[in-house]
């Protein structure tokens, strides 16, 4: 899903969502009593100081925060339609400019442990559900 967004000429949102839905429906069919949690995609930061714009374009492909917001909205809608629980971790990782906080990221896409700690904090209420 997320990795496919990095390959600009291969990425099609419709295909991503279709595959995502298919996987969720297969899980529901095979494990009907299982509660499914669906988590948002993480934001990115394409504006880190010293980043070469051409390298960023090549590395990130179609993975922009605008695209991620739209995909997350579709994932949330799909989760609701399929009676899954959607967990938004996108917003808690953003800086004031709407990018993944620089202190959470290695190169704008992958996170350090402190970024994952924020995600874990957001997930804890769901992990502690009975």
Sequence positions of predicted segments:
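Acidic/histidine-rich helix-loop elements
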Residues: 9-11, 108
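Short, small-residue-biased leader/transition segments that mark boundaries at the very start
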Residues: 1-7
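Charged helix-capping and loop-helix junction motifs
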Residues: 12-21
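Catalytic His-Asp segment of secreted/periplasmic serine-dependent ester chemistry enzymes
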Residues: 44-130
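N-terminal cationic-hydrophobic initiation segments that often serve targeting/anchoring roles
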Residues: 24-29, 79
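A short helix->loop->beta-strand "cap" motif at the edges of active sites that frequently abuts
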Residues: 31-35
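Structural beta-sheet core signal
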Residues: 38-40
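Generic structural signal for well-ordered alpha-helices
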Residues: 20-25, 72
């Amino acid at each position: 899903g997320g990795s496919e967004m990095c390959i600009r000429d291969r990425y099609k949102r419709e295909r991503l969502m279709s595959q995502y839905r298919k996987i969720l429906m297969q899980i529901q069919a095979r494990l009907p009593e299982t509660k499914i949690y669906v988590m948002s995609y993480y934001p990115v930061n394409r504006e880190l100081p010293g980043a070469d714009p051409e390298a960023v374009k090549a590395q990130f492909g179609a993975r922009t925060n605008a695209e991620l917001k739209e995909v997350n909205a579709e994932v949330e809608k799909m989760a609701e339609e399929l009676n899954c629980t959607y967990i938004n971790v996108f917003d808690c990782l953003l800086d004031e400019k709407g990018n993944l906080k620089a202190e959470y990221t290695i190169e704008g896409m992958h996170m350090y442990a402190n970024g994952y700690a924020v995600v874990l904090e957001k997930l804890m209420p769901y992990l502690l559900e009975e």
